[in-house]
Structures are given as C-alpha cells and as structure tokens.
Amino acid sequence: NSSTQNVGDIAVDWKSGTIWVGTGENNSSRSSYAGIGILKSTDKGKTWTNVGLLDSHHIGRILINPNNPDEVIVGSIGHLYSSNKERGVFKTTDGGKTWKKTLFIDENTGIIDIQPVPNNFNILYAAAWERESKAWNVDGDGKNSAIYKSTDAGNTWTKISDNNGFPNGKGVGRIGLAVYDENTVYAFHDNQFRRKKDSTKSAKGSGALTKEELASISVDEFLNMKDKKLNSYLKMNGLQEKYRAENVKQIIRSSPGEMRPSDLVGYLKDANAALFDTPVIGAEVFKTTDGGKTWKKTHEGHLDDLYYSYGYYFGEIRVDPQDQNGIYVLGVPILKSKDGGKTFTSISKENVHADHQALWVNPKKQGHLIDGNDGGLNISYDDGESWIKLNEPAVGQFYTVYADNQENYKVYGGMQDNGVWVGNHNAKIDKSWHQTGKNPYESLMGGDGMQVAVDDRNPNIVYTGYQFGNYYRI
C-alpha cells in the first residue's frame, strides 16, 4: 500500500519472511519512474515500513547476507534526470535503522548491479554506471562506468577494470554481472564506443538494403519495399528505436513530388549522423578467471540484433550455477552460450515476447528457467528450447485508458511495449478463450501503445499511435 508502483529490485530472507524492496525502476528509459527509497516487510508483505534512502530515486540491486538478515547491501543508481549524492553502495547492519555509504564515485554515477560470490558474502562485485537522461536524449555511458570489488562484505571497494582488458573511457555503458565463483565472473557490457569502419560488416551481396540503393531507387520502388527489409536497415544503423518502416514510408507519402528516398538518406543522417554511419559496438561479454585482475572478451565480432542502440534498457546476464560455461544474456532476444561466451544461440521463441528484463536459473535443476520480459513471464524446462507462457499475472503497464461515447461503449488501452487493445466495456476475461481462440480484446497496434481518440461521428474511425509521435487513423 505504499505510494509507488515502481520497483528496481527485491530481496527476500525466506527463513524470517522478511522482504526488502528497492523502489524506482532500474532501466533508464524515458518512461522509467522514480521510487521512494527502501521498503521493508517483516510479515511476508502484509505491512511495510520505509527504511530510508528516499532520495536514491532508482535502486539497482539489493543483497541480504544469508548468514545475517540484518546486514543488507544496496546499489543506488540515483536520479535519472539530475545529479544527486544519494547514489552508490549503501550498507546497513541493523536492519535498515541506519545506513552507511561505502562507495561513492560522483553525483552522476551510481551502482546498477552488485553480485556476491556464492557461499562467500565477503566477496562482492559491483558495476558502476554513469548515465544521464534528458527529455530528448538518454546518455547511457561515461568514463566513470566501471567494475569494483569488495573482499570485506561491502565495507571497502577497489576498482578492478582499469587497463586490464576491460574497456575504459567515455564510451563505457551499462554493465551487468554474473558470478560463478570468487575468480570466475562474467561482465555484460553496453559498449557505446563507435565501431571502426572496417569492423562493420558490409551488407552488400546479402540482399540487404544499402545506403547506395536507398539513394537511387524510385518512390514507387521504395513504397513497395517490404517493411522487413527497411526495418532491418534501420536496425543495422542503430535507428530502430526512433524509426519504423511504416512511419518512414509515411514521410515520403506525405510529401508527394517534394521528397524522394534519396532525400531520406540525408534526413536520417542529420537525425543521428554518428549512429547512421558508424554504429556503436553494442553488447559484448567479458570474463575474468582471476578475480578481476584481468578481463578478456569471450567472443569475436559483434553481438548484433541484441541491444541495437538502447542497451541502457537491458544489461542482465546469468551464469548456470552448475556450469561455469553456461551463460544467458538478455536483450531484445535472449541468447545462451554453452561454451563460456564464445558462441551464442537465440532461445527466443514465437510465444516469448521481446525485451528481456529478468531471468531465474534453477540452481538445482539444469535447464529450468523463468524469464521475465516486456510481455510477462515464460517458463522453460529444456534450457529454452520451448517455453510455456504464464499469462495469469496482471503485469501490464498502461500508458492510457480511453472509452468512446457509444451507448454500448468500447474501452481502449495503450500499453508499454504491448500495443493498443480494445474490447467491449462489459468484456470478461476467463480461460475459455484458450479453448475457443476468441479473446474478447483485440490488438490494434504494436509497440508502446499511446493515446487513443475515437471519432464521435463515426466510432469506426480510431486515432492512435506508438512511441515517438507515430500516429495513425484506423
């Protein structure tokens, strides 16, 4: 019953039934909302108490010492849109009555992840993240993004990612951590440095759209181009978040005789020149086998189609507790590796939503996974070869709800990454549609579903859209 719906992390002491909740989302998107500090329940969630860190705004991680439930470590990311001091690593040894800041980098750098060594809470690894958001841009990298290590349960920290194989400098982005043992650690890095020109794979000869082709084709050829081909081109150049084939084509349609596909090259280039010509390196996995003394990239080449240009929205990695070479990385798809990150395969399936945010790997049964994504929850018992969709929890995030003015009115909802849906006002959801295939709600559009308006003169005309101002009449 607290005055927030935004959660960054949860930690539970199962023996005592004590639950710790770090409020404020840890994904630094434009729609990521601040929280109200740390909440604690000592009666399995019946009642809650705020135990401080109110100005942290966004919590990256909470860890409970399994041998002392009053000892808790918190990673605070800090404000998203401004600088502040209540960020870094905080520790309590009295159940949240008092807090001590044990690691502080600066007012723009917080802690996005902390992971303990299994069975040794004294050794902790933490990921610092320098980031700042504006209404018009997310800056998700900085020279203070780095990896730290503690050998005294979080009381003191040492940076372990300087000039030892891990990237340094202004292009270091969000980092996720997975710890197998005290020496073996994986780091999942959103590398925002630009790719070298000669390292960007050429699309020539592959049937993919090129800048040269785009500059020479006619308007009719462009409008008849398959959306998949154009969307692949936009993704390859890091523009997937802002542009889709539909709205790029609409730009051409809306200016007959005035704008050609060749103009689009310059238009997109001006919109984001650096990303257009030299995409960022993007997602990459590093590994240490000596407790952070040295780091080495696990794979050759780029992990394309995993992060695109918005790695600040992801950053989670897991290692199989029974197999140090079994790792999982989460992005738009979910990938797994069985050879320590040398090669990866996608385990995203047709009934699994994109954009993966959380993953539980059963420490006692290999192949048993629970995946949390922007479409809800999925469970697998065969290491991601097949998934069951858990569609019962009401976990949708609505941006808007709208009702038209008919007597037998319809209700519309725009949802985060689940599009726009409509149903009759008296529609009831039960499990019968699993048998009949007739869901009382209908999807009108994908993406981030936004505002809806219905023409009062003709309720069959609906105006709606998705993120970045892309609106349509249906």
Annotated model-derived regions:
Residues 1-474:
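Beta-propeller blade termini and top-face loops
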